[in-house]
């Protein structure tokens, strides 16, 4: 499946998200756009953490899977966003998500500096500034459903995600 959800980040003029501090003016405007997109599609489910810091900004997004389990995903916003692909982890329930021996078939990496499991959502070489945090979270949401499919059937996570294109 090809992801066709692209947002023309130049088409809309929005106020700055924040007093940009370490962010450039263009990054501040972009983060304002990202914030409005996330508020529209994930109302009351996204929490911005340190949004004025271009070295420690992140978002936590809460989701409920189709089976009713609750998860929180964390996205780390890189200091050169949107030029670089952000990292994403499963923050909660961190203890329930195991380490996977085969990173290729699980689409999950090692644990990060906070001890959370990294989730592969984009090939970093295919990332462009036209991708959005909304797309990152949607791919994370799909990973959660594939993970739950893995729990119920024993199939590799890749079984559910192998059809996804970048």
Model-derived features: positions:
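UBC/E2-like fold recognition across ubiquitin and ubiquitin-like conjugation systems
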Residues: 1-74, 80-166
